[in-house]
Amino acid sequence: MNILERAALTALHRMDPEKAHSLSLSALRSGLVPLPGPVTSSRLATDVGGLVLPNPVGLAAGYDKNAVALAALMRAGFGFLEVGAATPRPQPGNPQPRLFRLTEDRAAINRFGFNNDGAATICARLAMRPRGAVPVGLNLGANKDSPDRAADFAAVLAACGPHADFATVNVSSPNTERLRDLQGRQALTALLEGVMQVQAGFARPVPVFLKIAPDLSDADLAEIAEVALASGIAGIVATNTTLARDGLRSAHARETGGLSGAPLFERSTRVLARLSELTEGRLPLIGVGGVASAEEAYAKIRAGASAVQLYTAMVYQGIGLAARIARGLDALLLRDGFGSVAEAVGTGRADWLT
């Protein structure tokens, strides 16, 4: 991290977390933030569920919820971006305060509740984005007051799919009441059938991923793997934030919401490895949760991920983190004799299954 980035983070950390979040997006949009540019190599370039990525380090949904800073983020060293979640209608989300830094734990807790500008506005921004080598996907959500949340996911995809490179069905946010109930076998099967029917009508392929929670039993994971394999989706994103609070030291540790960051790394990686085992490599996995270094990205890949995503670590290490991780990952692949990311996927899975 350079001096300018460190100074900017210090200033942001003196502010309310949600205001700092908004200010960081404004700074990106205005061109005030020095950006590292694209990062790729023959080892880093990879294909995940039909997506051709310059590198496997992606931006998780939740940072640029409303797709307002895409041009800048495409120059920040990420291999792919995910915006949203978008819901059919705009909604304000939960009351503030709803975002908390857990500095001692290198973590955050949020209870945003799918606050966003709505599918129509976000779709328009996706349509206007610059085209380039960095795929941009949309996280699909449901309105809090919707009488048919499963239909909401299909509706957002129908509206925005033509302007997105991929889509992620988010049934795992802990901040919308009973949303996680849609991870059950029957509900998930019906939901994915509706989404895939919409996808089948597109003129070009739009890979659909499913984002799951880290707080699932082994039986739940087995059911999800079975449904996912049968549904025709492109892959699984593992995982969203957790409701667990094990070992936290921060004063905000008991705030309601989803916990992200360093404390999630082990839990989410174990879920990832188990899914890799259950799907036997037949379904690409994207590893999310606690990635803050090249070594942690590499561990996720060796546990079974074809790519990774990050967000919370940027709160503590700045916008240049993705590029640093991608370059470090390239060096680790070279060190261990892997000619590509794909060659390394799952080679350390057994370490996470004990």
Curated annotation (Swiss-Prot):
GO molecular function: dihydroorotate dehydrogenase (quinone) activity
Topology class, membrane: Peripheral membrane protein
Cofactor(s) this protein cannot do without: FMN
Residues that coordinate or bind substrate: K65, N110, R111, F112, G113, F114, N170, N175, N240, T241
Catalytic activity: (S)-dihydroorotate + a quinone = orotate + a quinol
Keyword match Cell membrane: yes
Keywords recorded for this protein, A-Z: Cell membrane, Flavoprotein, FMN, Membrane, Oxidoreductase, Pyrimidine biosynthesis
Catalytic residues identified in the record: S173
Residues engaged in binding FMN: A61, G62, Y63, D64, K65, A85, N139, N170, K211, T239, G261, G290, Y311, T312
Primary localisation category: membrane
CC cofactor note: Binds 1 FMN per subunit.
Reported function: Catalyzes the conversion of dihydroorotate to orotate with quinone as electron acceptor.
Assembly: Monomer.
Family per similarity comment: Belongs to the dihydroorotate dehydrogenase family. Type 2 subfamily.
Protein name: Dihydroorotate dehydrogenase (quinone)
Gene name for this UniProt entry: pyrD
